[in-house]
Regions:
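Acidic/His- and Gly-rich active-site-bordering loop/insert found
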Residues: 2-117, 136-143
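Conserved active-site and cofactor/substrate-binding residues in soluble primary-metabolism enzymes
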Residues: 10, 14, 36, 40, ...
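Generic secondary-structure signature for well-ordered alpha-helical cores
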Residues: 13, 24, 50, 136-139, ...
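Predominant activation on well-ordered alpha-helical scaffold segments within soluble catalytic domains
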Residues: 46, 125-132, 161, 225-233, ...
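Acidic/histidine-rich catalytic neighborhood of metal-dependent amide-processing enzymes
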Residues: 112, 118-194
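Short small-residue beta-strand/loop micro-motif enriched in glycine and branched aliphatics
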Residues: 112-114, 209-215
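Flexible glycine/proline-rich, aromatic-decorated loop/lid segments
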Residues: 190-206
């Protein structure tokens, strides 16, 4: 292991330069004008996978952006890990809030700033370089590896389900590793064994055939904005519990051992509240903040 760590330290500057080149590609999947950049990023990713020593690296075409796959399956008798990540990134607006150009990676106080540095190119790059270090120094990996990197995570992964279904046997593994979720705290690695899903609905409420001037018609007809506010206000009780019938029916209760493990974590509610800039924390009264964040569903409003 020491030789692997030494290799990483020796190649640190090269790693940073390569990561900067990766981060310089504006692979914004949500914007059609960046379609060629997303493709270029997929090709860059595939070439990086080949360079580190992965086998059978391919760009699999989909109706959308390519899915890049590679593998190393020479650890006989060892478990197989499927690593998932994505090479597409979010849009960068508003640009005026950036302290440095989003696609010109900048190192400040030992940290690298660019779009994708933390979601998810940085993590993808980290795993690839760990593989490279092992293969360069020992010519082997302690486990078998399969890599799946998509280019549509930031727009809903529309083509990932079909890709996985069509290749169930090819992608079979003992465990799946996804490095696209937050750490518990700085310097505290985290293993997430479950994530909340997402169901969203759009409400369109119309009151009259056309817009009405409030000075001329206010008080004569119901204002849709107020009606919608009244509807939304009934979704939760004063304690934060969702009042929609059946909302909690399929929610698995937390096991006592899980609650005990949560309590062991060094979570400081005052620090958390200060970090997010909230005057106070709020939610279901019978659950701690971590339990509400990690193990309970919620009902939120965007708009």
């Amino acid at each position: 292991m020491n030789t692997i760590i030494d290799f990483i330290h020796t190649n640190r500057d090269r790693y940073i330069d390569e990561l900067k080149a990766y981060l310089a590609i504006p692979s914004i999947s949500a914007l059609p004008e960046h379609a060629s950049d997303v493709r270029r990023c997929a090709e860059w990713t595939a070439e990086a996978m080949r360079r580190v020593g992965l086998d059978h690296v391919q760009l699999h075409e989909t109706p959308g952006n390519p899915i890049v796959c590679g593998e190393w399956l020479k650890a006989e008798g060892a478990p197989t890990i499927l690593y998932y990540g994505h090479y597409d990134v979010q849009p960068v607006d508003p640009l005026e809030l950036w302290e440095s150009p989003p696609f010109e990676a900048t190192v400040r106080s030992g940290e690298i700033y660019a779009r994708g540095a933390a979601d998810d190119k940085g993590q993808v790059f980290m795993h690839l370089k760990a593989i490279e270090a092992h293969l360069r120094q020992t010519s082997k990996l302690p486990v078998n590896m399969k890599i799946v990197l998509e280019g549509e995570e930031e727009v809903g992964s529309e083509n990932l389900d079909a890709f996985i279904r069509d290749r169930r046997d090819e992608l079979s593994a003992d465990v799946v590793v996804i490095s696209d979720s937050p750490m518990f705290d700085r310097g505290v690695p985290s293993i997430c064994y479950g994530l909340r899903g997402l169901t969203y609905f759009q409400i369109d409420l119309r009151g009259t055939a056309s817009d009405l001037h409030s000075g001329s018609f206010g008080g004569a007809v119901a204002n849709p904005a107020f009606v919608l506010s009244q509807v939304l206000a009934q979704m939760k009780d004063r304690g934060g519990r969702v009042k929609v019938p059946g909302f909690y029916d399929a929610v698995r209760p937390l096991r006592e051992e899980e609650r005990a493990e949560f309590k062991k974590l060094p979570f400081n509610e005052k620090h958390y509240r200060k970090e997010i800039g909230a005057p106070k924390l709020f939610g279901e009264r019978d659950y701690t903040t971590l339990e509400r964040l990690w193990a309970r569903p919620t009902f939120e409003v965007n708009g």
